[in-house]
Design a protein with these regions (language model features):
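Lipid deacylating catalytic domains
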Residues: 1-108, 112-214
Length: 214
């Protein structure tokens, strides 16, 4: 208990989107480390459908801000799979929590990875004595392919319903990447913007960022 309380470890835990693997962020991590005197370690975990986990990489004892990427064998789309992935991620997080004894972390989710993080934070985060400091979602379709808030997906309705379970000290950034001002061709901008109905007023702060151009 004392060791966890005094821990300096603050991992950045990333979840890729549908059809992506635990290798999704390799390029970004390499670029991040290229101009840093102090390199971030990279631990990659693949959660198999049978519950087993494959670990690759390591976290050094002196690394206070390692990057952990969690991918899934079941990386398909759809609300039922998002819930399955959140449940499997919880099992993975429990192992990380016991093994590394951290008391806080930062969260990044790309596309459906942001949905998995949101589902986890609403349903499982209270199980851990951890401060979830920041959540950044990148192009996460909170209303799936719907173009309008007039038609809410079941997932969005549930996320809004259970948003009171979100950590109240969480800082959230929602990034919408668009080639035009309407849609990036894959995720409707309105679907990303729907995140505000989940987070505003429920977390410490919520900021939506729209990136346009190349």
């Amino acid at each position: 208990m004392a060791r966890r309380y005094n821990s300096q470890l603050s991992p950045v835990i990333m979840i890729p989107g549908s059809s992506a693997t635990e290798n999704r962020f390799d390029g970004m991590v390499a670029q991040l480390n290229s101009d840093q005197p102090k390199k971030h370690g990279l631990l990659k975990i693949k959660v198999m459908n049978n519950g087993k986990m494959k670990f690759k990489g390591k976290i050094s004892a002196r690394d206070t801000e390692p990057i952990i990427v969690v991918g899934f064998e079941n990386n398909r789309d759809g609300y039922s799979n998002i819930k399955k992935q959140a449940r499997m991620f919880n099992e993975c997080f429990a192992q990380l929590y016991e093994r590394y004894e951290f008391n806080n972390c930062k969260c990044i989710g790309h596309s459906n990875g942001g949905l998995v993080w949101t589902c986890f934070l609403e349903n499982y985060s209270k199980n851990y004595d951890v401060s979830f400091k920041k959540l950044m979602t990148i192009g996460s379709p909170y209303n799936f392919s719907e173009q309008s808030m007039k038609k809410k997906s079941q997932m969005l309705s549930d996320f809004i319903k259970y948003s009171y379970r979100l950590p109240d000290d969480l800082i959230v950034y929602s990034v919408a990447g668009t080639e035009t001002y309407t849609s990036d061709g894959l995720v409707p901008e309105k679907s990303v913007e729907a995140g505000k109905y989940i987070f505003q007023g429920k977390v410490k702060s919520f900021t939506q960022i729209t990136v346009t151009g190349d």
